[in-house]
Amino acid sequence: MSDRLTLLRPDDWHIHLRDGAVLPHTVADVARTFGRAIIMPNLVPPVRNAQQADAYRQRILAARPAGSRFEPLMVLYLTDQTTPEDIRTAKASGFVHAAKLYPAGATTNSDSGVTSIDKIFPALEAMAEVGMLLLVHGEVTRGEIDVFDREKVFIDEHLRRVVERFPTLKVVFEHITTGDAVQFVNEASANVAATITAHHLLYNRNHMLVGGIRPHFYCLPILKRNTHQVALLDAATSGSGKFFLGTDSAPHAQHAKENACGCAGCYTAYAAIELYAEAFEQRNALDKLEGFASLHGPAFYGLPANQDTITLVRDEWTAPTSLPFGELTVIPLRAGETLRWRLEEHA
């Protein structure tokens, strides 16, 4: 087994960078490894149009480390009021690559999200016409639905209908967490794909709940049982172009996580590819990591793969116990624990 692994530079097809004083920290972490990233638009207020997307993009570019060529790929936040013209203008910009469906109340800063999917059908029709991708947070939010069942119910009640109604629309089912989602994506047309996070590959709900509640494992969609984790590992390491890397790295300040009502999100960007390497190594599938991390995503988005490379070295190191987050701190996933792979830094 080799102690070095060289890959075409990967991309992150789902990340939260936040805004303001934290950007120099979050952008540096993602730019260290990834050539491009799909930037989530759930700011306050959200990124609803091309003008707001461009302003956010400029703030991200300004926060890049010196010499960085990292490219943010921008996303619109769909609301009940999103118009076909909003979509066409965003597509024409050249820097907006997708629009995101957040069911209202499903996750962090989703209060402005879609209250009924029927209300965005005109926008979805325009997206299909111009070739803009739909990114989906696939959970229902009704109070009577168990939090562990929200993804499956969303598939049955909404996602099947969208895919059937708009067969030419490219859809990314983001951060899938269940065997049900894997099956749906595998059985759907070539226009349907999914991202999978490192934390959903490495962990299940026992890690979060057994022996005490561990708030830094709390994310949405929530970690599921081990059988679903196994299904995700099967999908990620299958070699199928329908599955690719999306960290859903989502930082919150330490006090907002370690709280009686803590926020959802795991911060993984500081060591994302290293964490994925651990998951793939567990399956003796390191030969499949480059496809998942560097090739499948660009192919689905219709973009070229990166041409430069990164190298991972089998070399244990200890994750930091905390990281700067503006004037506050963020506790990364695996804080203070040993990681088995290290990204080789080039001078």
Swiss-Prot record:
Its cofactor is Zn(2+). GO terms for molecular function: dihydroorotase activity; zinc ion binding. The modification N6-carboxylysine is found at residue 100. It holds the Pfam family Amidohydro_1. InterPro entries: Amidohydro-rel, DHOdimr, Dihydroorotase_CS, Metal_Hydrolase. Keywords: Hydrolase, Metal-binding, Pyrimidine biosynthesis, Zinc. The keyword Transmembrane helix does not apply. It catalyses: (S)-dihydroorotate + H2O = N-carbamoyl-L-aspartate + H(+). One of its GO terms (biological process) is 'de novo' pyrimidine nucleobase biosynthetic process. PANTHER family: DIHYDROOROTASE. Substrate binds at residues 16-18, 42, 137, 220, 252, 264. This is Dihydroorotase. One of its GO terms (cellular component) is cytosol. Zn(2+) 2 binds at residues 100, 137, 175. Catalyzes the reversible cyclization of carbamoyl aspartate to dihydroorotate. Belongs to the metallo-dependent hydrolases superfamily. DHOase family. Class II DHOase subfamily. The active site is at 248. It is an enzyme of class 3 (hydrolase). Binds 2 Zn(2+) ions per subunit. Homodimer. The keyword Iron does not apply. It comes from Pseudomonas syringae pv. tomato (strain ATCC BAA-871 / DC3000). Zn(2+) 1 binds at residues 14, 16, 100, 248. Its EC number is 3.5.2.3. The lineage of its organism: Bacteria, Pseudomonadati, Pseudomonadota, Gammaproteobacteria, Pseudomonadales.
